[in-house]
């Protein structure tokens, strides 16, 4: 918790800021506590929101989610104009929007970022994931990694990579369902991007436990089942049983086992559908975990 600033001379908390001199002064004894403070705000004053808007000379902050980072100018709309003037302004807006994406690279980037917006909106991903995916895509463009690959597959791969980097649990199947490309193509683009952008396995590692709450919510499982599933996964990790295995498959099997142990049974099919894996995968991971961890599962 921050301590209240006091005067070092008399310990009074009555301090005054003098914006003209850039000083903080003690109101009681006149001691100058700080000086040469730079005021980062505007030099003008405003007394309401509309006045602030009129006097402000700066636009919106830069955004990595816009192809031009939001630095271009847009021609606005004014319905009070005459019909002839409105028509003229419409033509100007049309030409101005064309100029903003005048070359192929700009058009491709604008399309890629609109695709990113669509994917992240449908997956309900947080903004920091969207921004990280945009950063990865721009870096891929800068390094010439897009050539020979579809924009959609590379952007979907960047979204998947961003999710893994920021530990936001989303499976490749979920992203492939939203993207307009095949899962295998996204997977190839993901591996290529990860290799060339130095996204090491350590950076991209997602603990299976990160998926537990997501899948358990969809299955309607209690906190008790979740805790048991996490215990199973932690033990599996300690024994090296998770290496090279799909996190989704492992979590599905752990939740299936935990649901049996805690009397909240879910079928292998139900668990497989939520995790977007096959029943065979759930069955195989289930057998491995039960056998290697010596778990005694009640017979239904």
UniProtKB/Swiss-Prot annotation:
InterPro entries (UniProt xref): Cyclin-like_dom, Cyclin-like_sf, TFIIB, TFIIB_arc, TFIIB_CS, TFIIB_cyclin, Znf_TFIIB
Keyword Transcription included in the entry's annotation: yes
Sequence-type repeats, residues: 114-197, 210-291
Any GO BP: transcription preinitiation complex assembly
Residue spans, zinc finger TFIIB-type: 2-34
Keywords: Metal-binding, Repeat, Transcription, Transcription regulation, Zinc, Zinc-finger
GO MF term set: DNA-binding transcription factor activity; TBP-class protein binding; zinc ion binding
Matches recorded under SMART domains: CYCLIN
Pfam families recorded: TFIIB, Zn_Ribbon_TF
One GO term describing the cellular component: transcription preinitiation complex
Annotated residues for binding of Zn(2+): 7, 10, 26, 29
Family: Belongs to the TFIIB family.
Task performed by this protein: Stabilizes TBP binding to an archaeal box-A promoter. Also responsible for recruiting RNA polymerase II to the pre-initiation complex (DNA-TBP-TFIIB).
Name of the protein described by the UniProt record: Transcription initiation factor IIB
Annotated organism of origin: Pyrococcus woesei
Gene, per the UniProt record: tfb
């Amino acid at each position: 918790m921050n301590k209240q600033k006091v005067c070092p001379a008399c310990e009074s908390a009555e301090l005054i800021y003098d914006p003209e001199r850039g000083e903080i002064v003690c109101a009681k004894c006149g001691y100058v506590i700080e000086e040469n403070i730079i005021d980062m705000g505007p030099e003008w004053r405003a007394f309401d929101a509309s006045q602030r808007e009129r006097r402000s000379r700066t636009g919106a902050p830069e955004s990595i989610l816009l192809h031009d980072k939001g630095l271009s100018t847009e021609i606005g709309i004014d319905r009070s104009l005459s019909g002839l003037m409105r028509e003229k302004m419409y033509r100007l807006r049309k030409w101005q929007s064309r100029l903003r994406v005048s070359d192929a690279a700009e058009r491709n980037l604008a399309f890629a970022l609109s695709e990113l917006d669509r994917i992240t909106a449908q997956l309900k991903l947080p903004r920091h994931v969207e921004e990280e995916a945009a950063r990865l895509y721009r870096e891929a463009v800068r390094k010439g990694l897009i050539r020979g690959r579809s924009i959609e597959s590379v952007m979907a791969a960047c979204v998947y990579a961003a999710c893994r980097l920021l530990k936001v649990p989303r499976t490749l199947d979920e992203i492939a369902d939203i993207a307009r490309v095949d899962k295998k193509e996204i997977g190839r683009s993901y591996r290529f991007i990860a290799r060339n952008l130095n996204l090491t396995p350590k950076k991209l590692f997602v603990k299976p436990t990160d998926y537990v709450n997501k899948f358990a919510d969809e299955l309607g499982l209690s906190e008790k089942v979740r805790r048991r599933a996490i215990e199973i996964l932690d033990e599996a990790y300690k024994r090296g049983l998770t290496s090279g295995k799909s996190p989704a498959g492992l979590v599905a099997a752990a939740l299936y086992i935990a649901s049996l142990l805690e009397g909240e049974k879910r079928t292998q099919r139900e668990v497989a559908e939520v995790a977007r894996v096959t029943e065979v995968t759930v069955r195989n991971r289930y057998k491995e975990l039960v056998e290697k961890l010596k778990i005694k599962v009640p017979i239904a």
